């Protein structure tokens, strides 16, 4: 189970630590080039969900589970038509209290937030690359904004191949073998 430790401010000498347990990872975003996850805390309502930097978390299994679902959702969005019919939605069996309605609206809004190429922005450059659940992902910087998103490399290869090539060219290095260096020295000594 995921955990996050928080020291209480009122403890002077004993430094008591309070541990929060992550129940579920709900969403992912990039803020100033750092990955943050929206977390549902065990024993707390959805109004207490918080965005936390990846480096502060100790729940790799939950993050991995979320990324698998996130990846499937992304691939599904690319293959399915955008519009959904109202007739296919199920009604909830729970009561529609004010809290239920608010939390449902929050979930719908967070799911409606466009990410990556869905935002319709023009890619400027690739800042970095990472492996996420076995898939290569690029951190894409967009033109006319300071924001960046993780996008599937497969998608970037199709939508902006020249930017992908530029990213690889910037990082391309040539390594000479020792025999090559010796041969060049011999040739220059003969001249």
UniProtKB/Swiss-Prot annotation:
PTM comment, free text: Phosphorylation of HP1 and LBR may be responsible for some of the alterations in chromatin organization and nuclear structure which occur at various times during the cell cycle. Phosphorylated during interphase and possibly hyper-phosphorylated during mitosis. Ubiquitinated.
GO terms assigned for molecular function: chromatin binding; DNA-binding transcription factor binding; histone deacetylase binding; histone H3K9me2/3 reader activity; histone reader activity; identical protein binding; methylated histone binding; protein-containing complex binding
Acyltransferase keyword on record: no
Domain Chromo: 20-78, 121-179
Cell location: Nucleus; Chromosome; Chromosome, Centromere
Ranges of biased composition (kind: Basic and acidic residues): 73-89
Cross-link (Glycyl lysine isopeptide (Lys-Gly) (interchain with G-Cter in SUMO2)): 32, 91, 102, 106, 154, 184
Protein name in UniProt: Chromobox protein homolog 5
Species of the source: Mus musculus
